[in-house]
């Protein structure tokens, strides 16, 4: 028994240390799989020895029985709110009051010169909580409530992964109350809403609501499954002082295992506070969590005590708020716009309101499912949210303010642009050889390029920088060309005459000739650029590159069956069907034929089948992709090893099949191929793969055909002989992965003039660094043209 108890204590200590390194220091020392192994070992030992389970064990974060209600908790030291600053003048006034309150006339010394030192940290947009530790163990968690009385949420805070159940180290007071914010990261919020949608559950308007709703669950098992995090920002009651400054307090708490903001900083005077505010304001949208301002506190704790409090807020702290990202306004109407693929999308027309410093009159509604989820009606009062460059969106309806004359939102039966019929899309779910059809969220105009809106967006996409890269064709010019009926498809761009262009608004002789040259220069695109330019639904730039690299010819891409396309990396069955359907469409084929025929486009980089694709096409892979009920990858491998060919599997007798697989799986295979449609489909897939030059091998091969396969390259600084996009394409054609960040896994860094921190890090890690000349030489050696 002693050995078991010792092992349990060892595991707890080790897991606590790893939790500390992961959540507080952000320096994980072991992979997740090893952490999971240790965790499950501890969990198993505690299950066998329940009398050894303690409340501070890492296993005790999974939640307990649901409560009927939260009990009330009185805060020994009130959790007060902070005063707010909205303008720089408010901060200057705050600093003046602090200086006068400390009786510090100009020229007197305090810390550094006559300036007051302030701690600076982001104001997290979450839920304030109090954590009470006795003898280093967490004994209670409570919400802020009204500042005097909160709710006991102890069982819930114990499930938050980065809240220590027992403090690290030693020297902590007998009684220690830590205060901070429970919040949800942006990524965690997106994951939560996605999972809620999948199960038909409630979604949340923003991360703050999600954090608050998750933390105040009566069933702590629900809280345990929510991606909550904690960041401490100060102390409540303590039985002993732990530092002389606020930053000293936080640094000490960090040593004891408490997560502290990575953005914590000391400012020497109010001007440095304003610099901090501006800096973090510029970086606000790049942070992994949402903040609604910055909190400044007098750093010296003795000075804090001297300044004291007024009403319900401290005189020594202030929250400098950012402009609001959410506002209330009225929904005046819902109009519908038509996109490149014909999607008819609702757009909210709003009573203009200022959100995050910008006047907003329109907001996206995504689709009619979103309108239904919100319960939105014209005339409603709604909450609008805007974050940086993100299009403003309606996140919530204030139902209690709905007027009596509110109207339902109706989808138009005909396209608002061209008058064509509008139909609701269908979603086809394919699994285990069966198809399930459900209504989609998107409504679509069937007018295709006869619809002016679709034509304009299709041309804008076709000429864009990452597609055909035709300079001089801006959105307004394309609108003119379409409105004047000078173009009716991408192919018509190549038929434009000088006389037609010079008559357009904004064009003269030089600009007209430059545009004609840019159009002519686009006649030799790479296969990847051309595929992307076609605007195939769900096919972005990276998928287009995969198609080009793997199949290496437009004919193969056009002919490829959906199941064949799923052999490609990151191409799932639904996307494969979108690609296949696009090339099956007669209208799309006519446009492509015109581009490659009368327009004279010549696609580059076509040739032999890609080595990566060739290595992935195995017989067991084909069997697995047929989605035979009860037959997974393991059974598929057994069939491939036993029979060697598809025809042998189809024609195998019962005895052979039964010797290979258990009865249930054997029967499933026989039943599947007894359906002639299934057998013929499998033969068609195999025939196409063989037409592409494949032959079966029972084992998956390592890709060796591409000289830079498995290598990660990074481009930094500027290049003179070619753009970074072109350099990236050429490296990727050789099998390299081109990343935006340098790490120990990086193989080579290409550094041009202006290279900064990435080059510094590469040198620190001892990585191979090439200049542009060395890159061009390397590409030439590998047979890639660089001119």
From Swiss-Prot:
CDD domains the record matches: BRCT_DNA_ligase_like, LIGANc
Catalytic residues (UniProt): 123
User: Key word Oxidoreductase present in the record?
Assistant: no
The protein's UniProt keywords, in alphabetical order, are: DNA damage, DNA repair, DNA replication, Ligase, Magnesium, Manganese, Metal-binding, NAD, Zinc
Biological process per Gene Ontology, one example term = DNA replication
What molecular functions are annotated in GO for this chain?
Answer: DNA binding; DNA ligase (NAD+) activity; metal ion binding
- Name the source's superkingdom: Bacteria
Instruction: Please list the cofactors this protein needs.
Output: Mg(2+); Mn(2+)
Q: Which Pfam families match?
A: BRCT, DNA_ligase_aden, DNA_ligase_OB, DNA_ligase_ZBD, HHH_2, HHH_5, Nlig-Ia
- The EC code for this enzyme is 6.5.1.2
* Stored SUPFAM superfamilies: BRCT domain, DNA ligase/mRNA capping enzyme, catalytic domain, Nucleic acid-binding proteins, RuvA domain 2-like
Which residues of this UniProt protein bind Zn(2+)? 415, 418, 445, 451
Note the InterPro entries from the entry. Answer: BRCT_dom, BRCT_dom_sf, DisA/LigA_HHH, DNA_ligase, DNA_ligase_AS, DNA_ligase_CS, DNAligase_adenylation, DNAligase_N
Q: Which Gene3D superfamilies does this entry report, sorted A to Z?
A: 5' to 3' exonuclease, C-terminal subdomain, 6.20.10.30, BRCT domain, DNA ligase/mRNA capping enzyme, Helix hairpin bin, Nucleic acid-binding proteins
Query: In which residues is NAD(+) bound?
Result: 32-36, 81-82, 121, 144, 181, 297, 321
Q: What's the catalysed reaction?
A: NAD(+) + (deoxyribonucleotide)n-3'-hydroxyl + 5'-phospho-(deoxyribonucleotide)m = (deoxyribonucleotide)n+m + AMP + beta-nicotinamide D-nucleotide
User: What role does this protein play?
Assistant: DNA ligase that catalyzes the formation of phosphodiester linkages between 5'-phosphoryl and 3'-hydroxyl groups in double-stranded DNA using NAD as a coenzyme and as the energy source for the reaction. It is essential for DNA replication and repair of damaged DNA.
Q: Which family does it belong to?
A: Belongs to the NAD-dependent DNA ligase family. LigA subfamily.
Protein name listed in UniProt: DNA ligase
Q: Which gene is transcribed and translated to give this protein?
A: ligA
